[in-house]
Amino acid sequence: DVCSSDLNVYGPQENHKGKMASMVFHMYNQWLAEKKVKLFDAYGDYGAGEQTRDFIYVKDVVKVNFFFWDHPEISGVFNCGTGHAHTFNTLAKGVLKHFGSGELEYVPFPEVLKGKYQSYTQADASKLLAAGYDGGFTDVDEAVAEYCAVLDKTGGYYTHEA
């Protein structure tokens, strides 16, 4: 049996998640509503928008799951992440690039999150790679562009045409 801990998944089919949907989803919708994307200002050791996450595209999560399906002899608990952290600025710039315009605005870091917020997360993907996964991961800029295109075309859902 395999249990995977999926880290910061983004991509099509997440509309139902509401406030828990990915940053890309929220940035895209912020741009539609306000023609700008808002990120947290500097906090602690991290500059404005420089907080990071190990963002993984939903297509890559599917590839990892198929890898385990194809290898029933493998068992254990695995992190399903890329092993590389990217900044929120990276995602925001990808969304703004998609639209060809817009503003990146930094908002004060919320008092309620101070001392509780993780400014850096990154998966340890070494166990996944040691198990033999070699399917790679989609470049974050490419994935953000693809996801924004799906949001444009279908509102965020894959269809036979998308």
Feature names for model-found ranges:
Residues 1-4:
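Short, small-residue-biased leader/transition segments that mark boundaries at the very start
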Residues 8-9, 55:
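PG/GG-rich flexible active-site loop of Rossmann-like NAD(P)H-dependent oxidoreductases
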Residues 12-15, 127:
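Short beta-loop-alpha junction of Rossmann-like oxidoreductase domains
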Residues 14-19, 116-119:
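Short, solvent-exposed loop/turn segments at secondary-structure boundaries
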